């Protein structure tokens, strides 16, 4: 088993030659930029994040701007990244920093950990990467490197497995160069010790990696227990009036919280009944091509029902909704399936 000191030495020796140093959030490593990038990178690939990060920073360059921005704008900038609770928590945390810390990002681990949406690893990344403070991290990439190198059995989502990995992470994190070490660990996981087809021959840790020695990299980290995802159906009502389409804002919590979506119904009968209640004729209702959208915990089969020449009336004057202009789209957050359907309507 590789000793902690040797592990850290090999990682720090590898980074200057092969690590990533030109990512947009590495140009100016402020706590705000590191925080934003770390949150965006959760469950999302670097290549996907880069343009979102750049657009976000252009519009909301600091924590004060983020706190002052309407949530709709934050969600709009996030549209397409998914896991929208991340955006809502960013906004909430920025407002907390302004209210409780006079707009200065806290530099205490406990104060950062108390902010909405920030866990132990993200807090450690913020402090180590931007300020050089001695904190370990354990994101998905780091879990994979450690699980393979030390042959840690079990799925990292299990508390005891995660605790074991945290202990190893703390043991191997060096006293000096912690920011560079943590960045190197994330880079190793992303570039070398990848989920499939890892480049073991290029890894600085291969001389002491237990998975490499036993030709068992595919075994680590352990897989999440297989679960059959339940299936649900939703009928989306696409009401169009010229270049405008009616959207309703979802409640602030729950699925697609705070985003704008089409009116949604579990059954076609419910949709027709709602139209009848609003005094809207359903004779021109057309079904568009259905498609599936998969969440982490269920499949949603979406059946789009399109109705043209619907004029504003009744509930459609409600402040909880808006007529979305396809020609001049407003800056609001959209669920991915909604954005897809709006693009489809705009092309018609």
Region locations from a protein language model:
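Catalytic cores of DNA base-excision repair glycosylases
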Residues: 3-201, 205-218, 231, 280
């Amino acid at each position: 088993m590789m000793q902690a000191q040797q592990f850290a030495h090999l990682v720090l020796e590898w980074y200057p030659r092969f690590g990533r140093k030109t990512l947009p959030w590495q140009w100016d490593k402020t706590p705000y930029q590191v925080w934003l990038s770390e949150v965006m990178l959760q469950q999302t690939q670097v290549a996907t994040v880069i343009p979102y990060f750049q657009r976000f920073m252009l519009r909301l360059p600091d924590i004060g701007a983020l706190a002052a921005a309407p949530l709709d704008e934050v969600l709009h900038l996030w549209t397409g990244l998914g896991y929208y609770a991340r955006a809502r928590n960013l906004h909430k945390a920025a407002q907390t920093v302004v209210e409780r810390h006079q707009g200065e990002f806290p530099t205490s681990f406990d104060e950062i950990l108390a902010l909405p949406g920030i866990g132990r690893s993200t807090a450690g990344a913020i402090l180590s990467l931007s300020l050089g403070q001695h904190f370990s991290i354990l994101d998905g990439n780091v879990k994979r490197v450690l699980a393979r190198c030390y042959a840690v059995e079990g799925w990292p989502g299990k508390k005891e497995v995660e605790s074991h990995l945290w202990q190893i992470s703390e043991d191997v994190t060096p006293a000096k160069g912690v920011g560079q070490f943590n960045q190197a660990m994330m880079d190793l996981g992303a570039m070398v010790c990848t989920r499939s087809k890892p480049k073991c021959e290029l890894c600085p840790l291969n001389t002491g990696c237990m998975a490499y020695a036993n030709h068992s990299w595919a075994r680590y980290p352990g897989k999440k227990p297989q679960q059959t995802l339940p299936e649900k159906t939703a009928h989306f009502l696409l009401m169009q009036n010229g270049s405008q389409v009616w959207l309703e804002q979802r409640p602030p919590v729950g699925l697609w919280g705070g985003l704008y979506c089409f009116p949604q119904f579990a059954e076609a009968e419910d949709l027709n009944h709602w139209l009848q209640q609003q005094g809207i004729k359903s004779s021109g209702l057309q079904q568009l091509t259905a498609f599936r959208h998969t969440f982490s915990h269920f499949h949603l089969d979406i059946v789009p029902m399109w109705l043209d020449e619907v004029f504003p009336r009744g509930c459609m004057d409600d402040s909880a909704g808006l007529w979305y202009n396809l020609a001049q789209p407003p800056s609001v957050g959209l669920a991915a399936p909604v954005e897809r359907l709006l693009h489809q309507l705009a092309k018609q």
